[in-house]
């Protein structure tokens, strides 16, 4: 994901992609998200106040590499001298202060921009845990089965169970499924 991060007084165009952890591991022999994630952002996603300065320098180096457009350019053009010239344009704590925003680019990839196509069906009563267990038992799912399925599986089973009540003009055969 490409984004602009404000570091000090300057906006820096940064590319946060799958190459970042690979490059980081190749150079520093450490896990990128473990090092950076545990050093800069706490469990609530807030900026930590105590930050390892080595991790800041390493992250700044990765950021510098990610300002270059392609992975080939990174391998061909990024040198220590180039990095020192680039990082000297910033104040000492600029990177530490921007780490939450920088890490936000990486964590933003987990978010979705998709919105649901259908509105949730209005029911007469709220969907409680007891109602969920009742519907699961009606569909033939035992309490011990709930340990093996995730919520998506259960909802799929419940949807298929409710579809069983419908009558269809034609039911697919094994031959139809094989052709599909």
Where are the regions a protein language model picked out?
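Charged interaction scaffolds used for protein-protein
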Residues: 1-11, 18-26, 30-50, 54, ...
């Amino acid at each position: 994901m490409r984004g602009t991060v404000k570091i000090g007084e300057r906006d820096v165009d940064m590319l946060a992609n799958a190459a970042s952890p690979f490059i980081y591991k190749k150079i520093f022999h450490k896990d990128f998200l473990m090092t950076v994630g545990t050093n800069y952002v706490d469990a609530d996603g807030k900026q930590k106040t105590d930050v390892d300065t080595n991790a800041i320098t390493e992250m700044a180096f990765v950021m510098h590499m990610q300002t270059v457009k392609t992975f080939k350019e990174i391998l061909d053009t990024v040198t220590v001298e180039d990095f020192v010239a680039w990082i000297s344009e910033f104040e000492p704590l600029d990177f530490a202060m921007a780490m939450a925003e920088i890490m936000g680019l990486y964590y933003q990839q987990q978010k979705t921009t998709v919105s649901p196509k259908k509105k949730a069906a209005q029911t007469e009563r709220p969907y409680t845990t007891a109602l969920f267990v009742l519907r699961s038992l009606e569909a033939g799912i035992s309490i011990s089965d709930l340990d093996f399925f995730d919520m998506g599986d259960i909802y799929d089973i419940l949807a298929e169970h409710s579809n069983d009540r419908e009558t269809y003009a034609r039911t697919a055969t094994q031959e139809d499924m094989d052709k599909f």
